C-alpha cells in the first residue's frame, strides 16, 4: 500500500517523466545536427544569440542547444552525454539541484546548461571547492565551449585586477566560492567604477553544492584591516583635550549630550597641531579623534558610564547597572576613553566587509547545483535557497553491495577488525578505500597497516593536486587508500581492467554525524554499474554512539559475554544510529537557519550601503543628494534643540552655535531670527542660507573639480562610518546571547538594536558629509583614498570563523622621531608640545 502511495505522490518521479519528454525532443534533433560541419555547428551559437535578441527565450532554445552541445562534446571530448545527463542538465537549467551519483559525469552534464545560459551574454559562473578543480574543469570543458565560439575565463586568487576583469568578462567563468565572495566584497570597496571586476550576478552552477551551501554555510568571508595610525592619534587628541576649557574652547549641551569645539577651540587645535584648517579633508582622522576625546572627557563619566577593571574599560549598562564585559563603544569612543584613563589602547583589527556564502549565492538571478548527495538536506535547499533536489536516475543500475554495520564493543576491537579486513582484501588484489572522520584515525590505521606490511596512501585535504593523483590510482589492483572526511571529492576512482569483476571495497571506520557524508563515502564504489562493496565498522566508544546512549547496548554485550573480536550486526542499532544522525542534522540545520536570520539584519544594511556607493560611483553630479543630506541634518538639529513643549526651554542658542560652527560662518544664522519662528518653519531659511553658501563655493573652482570634491567627501565619510558600524555590529552580536538570560529574545533584540545603530550611522554620515562639504577647503590635487587597506581573511580549514585578534599598542613615538600627524616635523616640536 505504502509503495503504491509513494508512486502516486512521488514528485521526483513526475519531474523525471516530464524531463524524459524533453530528452526525446533532443534525441529527435540528432539526425539534423549530426551531419553539420564543425563550422556549421559553431555557427549555431550565433544563430541562437540572434534568436534570443528577436524575443525567443533560453527555454525555447533548450532542446536545440542541448543537441548542439551533445554533438560538440562527442567531437571535441570524445564523450557523448547520456539521456540521464541531459536530464541533469535540464534540472540545472531550471535552477534546481541535480543529485547525480558518483561517476555519472556531473562535470560533462554542467556543460549543457552552462552553454545555454551563456548565450545571453550575461555571464555564467561555474563554482568549485578548490582552485585545482576550477583549473581542471576550465581547461577540459573549456575546449568544448571555445569550439562552439564562447569565451572561457578562470578566476584565481593570485590574479591581478586586470586579469580578473578579463576572466569575469568571459561568457563562462570558472572560480572557487571563496574567490567569488571576496571579489564581490572588494568590488564594493573600490573608489572608481573602472576598478570593479564582477558583472551583475546572473547564473551560477555550484559543483559539490552541499559542501559549499551546507558545510561551509556558517563560515563568513571577512576582509579585515587595521587602522594603524589611530592609536597614537588617540593619545595626542587626549593630551590636547586636557588643555581645553569649558564654555571657552568647547560647548556642552547637557540635555542632548552634544559637545563641540567653539571657534576658539578650533583655533587652539590648529595651533597645537600646526595646521591651517582643522576641517580640511586631510585632517578628517585628527578631527574625529579630537571629537571622540572631547566626548570621553566631557560626556562619559567613570563609575557611571564605565568602570576601569583589570586595566580594561568595561561599559556599565545604563538600565540595569550591570557590567557589559566584551562590549565596546563604537566609532573610536572606547579607545578615546582608554587614552583618557591611561590604560593600554586596544586597536582591534577591523572587519571592513563580510558576507556569508548563504547571502552571497542568494544574490544570483538563478542558482543551481550538483552533487551526489543532497536529498537528506532537501528541506534546507528549498527553504533557504528556493531550489528543489531532483534525484537523477543512474545510467546503469547500481549493483553495489551495501552491507549492514558491524558494531564492536571497543575501539580497539573495531580497528583490529578493520585492518584484518583490509589485509584480506589486499591479498586478493581488491582495491580498498578507507574513510575516516579524523586525521588521528587515519594515522592510527596507517601505523597498523605498516606493521602488517601493507603499502598504502594517506589522503587528507592538504594538497589538492597530489590528491587527484592518489584518487586516480585508488582503483588499481591491490591499492589501499586512507581518506579523511572524503577528501578527493570531484575526482573519480576509475577501476583497473583487472579488478572490474570485483570492484572497489569502501570501508568506513565510524559513522559521520551527517548521513550525507556517509553516503558520499559509499558512493565512491559501484560507479557506472560497476560491482563494489561498502561496510561500516562502529564501536560503542565512537563519539556518535556515546552521544546518544550506547551504555545499554554495551551492558547487553557484556551480559552476553561477547568479547572485542565479536561484532553484532543489528538492524536496531543501525536504526538508532540513523535516528541519532537525523537529530544532529536537525540541530545543525537550526544553527545555520539561525545564523541566516542574524546575517539577514546585516545583509539588508549592506545592500543599502553598497547600492548607494554604486550610485555615487556612477553619478556625475552628487549635489542633489548632498542637499538632501543637509536638509535632513538641519531638520534633525532643529528637532533636537526644540523638543521641549514650553518655548522658553528651547535651546535656540545651542542650535545657532551648532549651525554656525559646523555648517555655516559666524553670524550667518542669528538667534533673534529663529526665535520668531515655529520649529517647523526654522529649517527653511537655514537651508536657503546653506544653498547660498554652497553656490558661493561652486563659483570658486571649475565644476569638474567641485564634483570630484563631493565624491571624495562622500566616499571618505561613508567608508569610515560603514566599517565602524560593521565592527559595532560584530560586538553587538557577540554579546547579544546574554540577553536570553533576561527572558528577552536575542534575535529580536539584535534586529532592533542593529536597526537603531544603522539609523544612527546614516544620520552621522549625513551630518559629517554636510560639515565637510561646507567647511573643508578644496585642494587642487584631490584624490579618492581607501580608508583602510583591506586584506581577505580566508576561512580556516576546520570551518571556524577567523577570530579577530586585539593588537595592543603603547606610545612608541621617540622625541626626535618624525611626528605621526604627517606635518613633517619632529615629534617634540609638533604634537609632543601638547603633552
Curated annotation (Swiss-Prot):
Per UniProt, ATP binds at: 85, 103-107, 492
Give me the reactions it catalyses. ATP + H2O + cellular proteinSide 1 = ADP + phosphate + cellular proteinSide 2
Highest taxon listed in the record's lineage: Bacteria
Q: Where in the cell is it found?
A: Cell membrane; Cytoplasm
GO CC field? cell envelope Sec protein transport complex; cytosol; plasma membrane
Name any cofactors this protein relies on. Zn(2+)
Extract the Pfam families matched here: P-loop_SecA (PF21090), SEC-C (PF02810), SecA_DEAD (PF07517), SecA_PP_bind (PF01043), SecA_SW (PF07516)
The segments labelled Disordered in the record are 788-807
Quote the cofactor binding remark: May bind 1 zinc ion per subunit.
Keywords per UniProt: ATP-binding, Cell membrane, Cytoplasm, Membrane, Metal-binding, Nucleotide-binding, Protein transport, Translocase, Translocation, Transport, Zinc
Q: Where does Zn(2+) bind?
A: 819, 821, 830-831
GO MF annotation: an example = metal ion binding
A single GO BP: protein targeting
Q: How does it sit in the membrane?
A: Peripheral membrane protein
Q: What is its EC number?
A: 7.4.2.8
Which HAMAP family does its entry note? Answer: SecA
Q: How does it assemble?
A: Monomer and homodimer. Part of the essential Sec protein translocation apparatus which comprises SecA, SecYEG and auxiliary proteins SecDF. Other proteins may also be involved.
The similarity comment for this entry is:
Belongs to the SecA family.
Biological role stated in the UniProt entry: Part of the Sec protein translocase complex. Interacts with the SecYEG preprotein conducting channel. Has a central role in coupling the hydrolysis of ATP to the transfer of proteins into and across the cell membrane, serving as an ATP-driven molecular motor driving the stepwise translocation of polypeptide chains across the membrane.
Protein name, per record: Protein translocase subunit SecA
Q: What is the lineage of its organism?
A: Bacteria, Bacillati, Bacillota, Bacilli, Bacillales
What gene does the UniProt entry assign to this protein? secA
Amino acid at each position: 500500500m505504502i509503495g503504491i502511495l509513494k508512486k502516486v505522490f512521488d514528485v521526483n518521479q513526475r519531474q523525471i517523466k516530464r524531463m524524459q519528454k524533453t530528452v526525446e525532443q533532443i534525441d529527435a534533433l540528432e539526425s539534423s545536427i549530426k551531419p553539420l560541419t564543425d563550422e556549421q555547428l559553431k555557427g549555431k551559437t550565433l544563430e541562437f544569440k540572434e534568436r534570443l535578441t528577436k524575443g525567443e527565450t533560453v527555454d525555447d532554445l533548450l532542446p536545440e542547444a542541448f543537441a548542439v552541445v551533445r554533438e560538440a562534446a562527442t567531437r571535441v571530448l570524445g564523450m557523448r552525454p547520456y539521456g540521464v545527463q541531459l536530464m541533469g542538465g535540464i534540472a540545472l537549467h531550471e535552477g534546481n539541484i541535480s543529485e547525480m551519483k558518483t561517476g555519472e559525469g556531473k562535470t560533462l552534464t554542467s556543460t549543457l546548461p552552462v552553454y545555454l545560459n551563456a548565450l545571453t551574454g550575461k555571464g555564467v559562473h561555474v563554482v568549485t571547492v578548490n582552485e585545482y578543480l576550477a583549473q581542471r574543469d576550465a581547461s577540459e570543458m573549456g575546449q568544448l565551449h571555445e569550439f562552439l565560439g564562447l569565451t572561457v575565463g578562470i578566476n584565481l586568487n593570485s590574479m591581478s585586477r586586470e586579469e580578473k576583469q578579463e576572466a569575469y568578462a568571459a561568457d563562462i567563468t570558472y572560480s572557487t566560492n571563496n574567490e567569488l565572495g571576496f571579489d564581490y566584497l572588494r568590488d564594493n570597496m573600490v573608489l572608481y567604477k573602472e576598478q570593479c571586476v564582477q558583472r551583475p550576478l546572473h547564473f551560477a552552477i555550484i559543483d559539490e553544492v552541499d559542501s559549499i551551501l551546507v558545510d561551509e554555510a556558517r563560515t563568513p568571508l571577512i576582509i579585515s584591516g587595521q587602522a594603524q595610525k589611530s592609536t597614537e592619534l588617540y593619545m595626542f587628541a587626549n593630551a590636547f583635550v586636557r588643555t581645553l576649557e569649558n564654555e571657552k574652547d568647547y560647548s556642552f549641551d547637557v540635555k542632548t549630550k552634544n559637545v563641540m569645539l567653539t571657534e576658539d577651540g578650533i583655533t587652539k587645535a590648529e595651533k597645537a597641531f600646526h595646521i591651517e584648517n582643522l576641517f580640511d579633508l586631510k585632517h578628517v582622522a585628527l578631527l574625529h579623534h579630537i571629537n571622540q576625546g572631547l566626548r570621553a572627557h566631557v560626556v562619559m563619566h567613570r563609575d557611571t558610564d564605565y568602570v576601569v577593571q583589570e586595566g580594561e574599560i568595561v561599559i556599565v549598562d545604563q538600565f540595569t547597572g550591570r557590567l557589559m564585559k566584551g562590549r565596546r563603544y563604537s566609532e573610536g569612543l572606547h579607545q578615546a576613553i582608554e587614552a583618557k584613563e591611561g590604560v593600554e589602547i586596544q586597536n582591534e583589527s577591523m572587519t571592513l566587509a563580510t558576507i556569508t556564502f548563504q547571502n552571497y549565492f542568494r544574490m544570483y538571478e538563478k542558482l543551481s547545483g550538483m552533487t551526489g548527495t543532497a536529498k537528506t538536506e532537501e528541506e534546507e535547499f528549498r527553504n533557504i535557497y528556493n531550489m528543489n533536489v531532483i534525484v537523477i536516475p543512474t545510467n546503469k543500475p547500481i549493483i553495489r553491495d551495501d552491507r549492514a554495520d558491524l558494531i564492536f564493543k571497543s575501539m580497539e576491537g573495531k580497528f583490529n577488525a578493520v585492518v584484518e579486513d583490509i589485509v584480506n582484501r589486499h591479498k586478493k588484489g581488491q582495491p580498498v578505500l578507507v574513510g575516516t572522520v579524523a586525521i588521528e584515525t587515519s594515522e592510527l590505521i596507517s601505523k597498523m597497516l605498516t606493521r602488517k606490511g601493507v603499502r598504502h596512501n594517506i589522503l587528507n585535504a592538504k594538497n589538492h593536486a597530489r590528491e587527484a593523483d592518489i584518487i586516480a590510482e585508488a582503483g588499481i589492483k591491490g591499492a589501499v587508500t586512507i581518506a579523511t572526511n572524503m577528501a578527493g571529492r570531484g575526482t573519480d576512482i576509475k577501476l583497473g581492467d583487472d579488478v572490474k569483476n570485483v570492484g572497489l571495497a569502501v570501508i568506513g571506520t565510524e559513522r559521520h554525524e551527517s548521513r550525507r557524508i556517509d553516503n558520499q563515502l559509499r558512493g565512491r564504489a559501484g560507479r557506472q554499474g560497476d560491482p563494489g562493496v561498502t561496510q561500516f565498522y562502529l564501536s560503542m566508544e565512537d563519539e556518535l554512539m556515546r552521544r546518544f546512549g550506547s551504555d545499554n547496548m554495551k551492558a547487553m554485550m557484556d551480559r552476553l559475554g561477547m568479547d572485542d573480536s565479536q561484532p553484532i550486526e543489528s538492524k536496531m542499532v543501525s536504526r538508532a544510529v540513523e535516528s541519532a544522525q537525523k537529530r544532529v542534522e536537525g540541530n545543525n540545520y537550526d544553527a545555520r537557519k539561525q545564523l541566516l536570520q542574524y546575517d539577514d539584519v546585516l545583509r539588508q544594511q549592506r545592500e543599502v550601503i553598497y547600492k548607494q556607493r554604486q550610485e555615487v560611483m556612477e553619478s556625475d553630479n552628487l549635489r542633489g543628494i548632498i542637499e538632501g543630506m543637509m536638509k535632513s541634518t538641519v531638520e534633525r538639529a532643529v528637532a533636537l534643540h526644540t523638543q521641549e513643549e514650553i518655548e522658553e526651554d528651547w535651546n535656540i542658542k545651542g542650535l545657532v552655535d551648532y549651525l554656525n560652527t559646523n555648517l555655516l560662518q559666524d553670524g550667518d544664522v542669528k538667534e533673534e531670527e529663529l526665535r520668531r519662528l515655529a520649529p517647523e518653519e526654522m529649517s527653511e531659511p537655514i537651508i536657503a542660507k546653506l544653498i547660498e553658501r554652497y553656490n558661493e563655493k561652486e563659483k570658486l573652482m571649475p565644476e569638474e573639480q567641485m564634483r570630484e570634491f563631493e565624491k571624495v567627501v562622500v566616499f571618505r565619510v561613508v567608508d569610515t562610518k560603514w566599517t565602524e558600524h560593521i565592527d559595532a555590529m560584530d560586538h553587538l552580536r557577540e554579546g547579544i546571547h546574554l540577553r536570553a538570560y533576561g527572558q528577552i529574545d536575542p534575535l529580536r533584540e539584535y534586529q532592533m538594536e542593529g536597526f537603531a545603530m544603522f539609523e544612527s550611522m546614516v544620520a552621522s554620515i549625513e551630518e559629517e558629509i554636510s560639515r565637510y562639504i561646507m567647511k573643508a577647503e578644496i585642494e587642487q590635487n584631490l584624490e579618492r583614498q581607501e580608508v583602510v587597506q583591506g586584506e581577505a581573511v580566508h576561512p580556516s580549514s576546520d570551518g571556524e570563523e577567523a577570530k579577530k585578534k586585539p593588537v595592543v599598542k603603547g606610545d612608541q613615538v621617540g622625541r626626535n622621531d618624525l611626528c605621526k600627524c604627517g606635518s613633517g616635523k619632529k615629534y617634540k616640536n609638533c604634537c609632543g608640545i601638547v603633552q
